[in-house]
């Protein structure tokens, strides 16, 4: 299945892996936020902007033939949070977990799962920071390239980040607190680099 999360927090699931999530129709000015490919018997894990992790069985999500449904109907999230990330995997699959404040760590899928509707505290965020999308880590990934909104680029070995069940993580890129608070500087994105890329 392909699990699709929209920017407005609507969720749905399409059969197979061939579907292009960008080609689906979205409500009004809503658009794609994130998607994940997996199996229908796996749990889909969603991260919100406050650093909480939630799980929903993939097979129970509404069909992508329609617009889906608001994820908040399935979960009891704090008011005003955005859902930023969708992931599907098996126990020891690894994901790069990061926030706009410049911190990150590697998490195993089994530690991202929550059996509570209210989710579980997963990443401790610096003040004024928000979660970024979780990025699947493959066996051949060796380096992380992190980029700030003002174009700072840092490339380092993936082994430099700890593997954690939850927590704050390590500083990936230096973001001054005052600039983060003012919205002037933040970690915008990271890319994983492989030995054969």
Give, region by region, the residue ranges found by the protein language model.
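Short, structured "edge-of-domain" segments at secondary-structure transitions
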Residues: 1-197
